[in-house]
């Protein structure tokens, strides 16, 4: 540590609460909490929480140039002080006469020729060794290593050059150093290398850094550089050294000492101090002359390819401990993380802690963790009802994947229940796909292939193909008024009503089954509206009365039923006038559209068609019944565009699984991020050209990647199987073939051409039935296949049990399953050592072993795969 007339700080290496300020004198301070019993009345306030108390002063060092604190616990508070005349004096602060430092305090180490002492460094292991770096002298060495336990040698130096003063004790003078290095040069800075305490790193005036080994001082390793000031070793990376010249810092790696690893950005002013943080790896602090800012360089370690010389990432920032005061020096706290004390030229001190850079990390399961200093924090998600409603879409998709959402291909509508059953858009989507599937199966039975493709094209395309529409007029059922209401019928409109779920398949167009299902679900208002739209006002009143008397019914439904019973078709009646004005005040949308229908003119049903709170399927079904061939396509087109822009899944009923459906689903994914629903939906019945759409492929691949990230490998395999059934073109080609070692032909290809044998890998080693032959040799050249490393049987022989476990409960009869695709009989081998065998045997072996089962082979087969030791999340 260099001093001068500007204050410098030196922290005790073993006392976390003591430090020394040195300029023209040495002042020992103790730092502690403000207001504590140890803090005296005259303490200096360093921060809002800490204050410093002066313990001792030593004013006997007027020509002090540098100071170094003794590295061991005992003797306590022993310091070496280098002077401008080259002498090194040992002194202590605040010690009693009985302390161990009594014999060493006052001891002086005198060079042959007087010149300035620039730097001092204690050996961290042999603590009796003290290295001093001096200015150049043509007849003397610049680096002297003193042994503080050595005695005075009167014959070594003339007496007139030994004595410091007339009354000095000659027993305290040492003039013969233990080692002398660096002849005809100057030493500006030096440090001991922690990795080898016999080595010393010197920085000399001849612009070189040199490493000396005290066991052979005639040999040295050196490199030419201008950065020869302030050499210091990173305490957490002992091969990394920092040095500086003027405003530039060089970082060295002692293992590759030819040139600096990298240099930091040059500062406009000369540097005065550089120091590594003792509590944080790779954090370097620098200070420039006449500055109030300390610059910090955080050196990050990033993985890099072998052989590439890539500089590490450095994050630079500046801190300003004092608002306006110039900083003379600073010192890191030896144990408190990111804490330092700074001092100004007027000895004003400030204690502060740096804010740590925070690193955030999201896991694939949406858990959040962040690191701050030495602490790791995990963010726990609130499990309350509000948090349940605000779950991230990734969390929802993960939970749905665990419930096998999307995989029910028989009762397709149940998929919305697997998703939680609380999303009306998902409910509408899966019911739409369910009705499409039902009608498709009915068409297949009737062998009407021309209609099969029309079903999944959506109501928009179905309506456009409508022909032969007939208009009928029907009277109200259950009303005294015999007003005729016009309705429209066609085969395509009936198909649309079936897809909306209003009527069932077949010639019967009765809505009564649909009304009963709505009553069972407690949707009284919706059921009454559907009955009213089918011109059965008495049934609507009956449903409302039943709903009012139910356990959770609304008594106001009786009032609505009473209002319906007074229906009249007279345009100027009081009933019609009051219903038109008061219906908008009704909070329930289905009650509102009921009165809108009753008070509207034929063909002008905007109050029903554009009520956004009503389900799309009900509005579309109403339109198919009451709009003519000119009005219906216009309305469907307008509603389709609204659904596409909003990304509303109810619009799949209109678009179908077509390009318009992909556009709608794209808006939905952009809004929600739900690639899971998008993938399953598009696989249900889309034509080949839609499945080849890059957007659809992107959703599917992203969902597969999500399953892999969640370690749902079994579920991803299920999804791939599900996908290959619905989209045969997605089945990937075989990527691995087993070829014969003798003839080189593919065994699987040869076997696939053999009659009565099945295809591919599946038949190897599976007995199947007595009539099936075993494939234990190459079908091409009849040479035997390799042997299993454990059972020593030729591959193709069926496995019986898994040897190597030694536990009866772990053994299994692997031949009880007679399927040809039994996994335990498959070939498996290590890509490194090429040894292998039956998959079942290999799995059993590597449960208890890490090395290859072949004798004399030390290959760690299972550990070569980074995922070899991972456990699927869906099997935990």
Curated annotation (Swiss-Prot):
WD repeats lie at residues 59-101, 112-156, 182-222, 224-262, 266-307, 400-440. The GATOR2 complex is negatively regulated by the upstream amino acid sensors CASTOR1 and SESN2, which sequester the GATOR2 complex in absence of amino acids. In the presence of abundant amino acids, GATOR2 is released from CASTOR1 and SESN2 and activated. GO terms for cellular component: cytoplasm; GATOR2 complex; lysosomal membrane. GO terms for biological process: cellular response to amino acid starvation; cellular response to nutrient levels; heart contraction; positive regulation of TORC1 signaling; venous blood vessel development. This is GATOR2 complex protein MIOS. It comes from the Eukaryota. The gene is mios. It comes from Danio rerio (Zebrafish). A zinc finger (C4-type) spans 738-784. It is found in: Lysosome membrane. Zn(2+) 2 binds at residues 791, 838, 841. CDD domains: mRING-H2-C3H3C2_Mio. Component of the GATOR2 subcomplex, composed of MIOS, SEC13, SEH1L, WDR24 and WDR59. The GATOR2 complex interacts with CASTOR1 and CASTOR2; the interaction is negatively regulated by arginine. The GATOR2 complex interacts with SESN1, SESN2 and SESN3; the interaction is negatively regulated by amino acids. Interacts with SAR1; the interaction is direct, disrupted by leucine and mediates the interaction of SAR1 with the GATOR2 complex to negatively regulate the TORC1 signaling upon leucine deprivation. Disulfide bonds: none annotated. A zinc finger (RING-type) spans 785-866. GO terms for molecular function: zinc ion binding. Belongs to the WD repeat mio family. Zn(2+) 3 binds at residues 830, 833, 861. Its main location: membrane. Zn(2+) 4 binds at residues 833, 835, 852, 857.
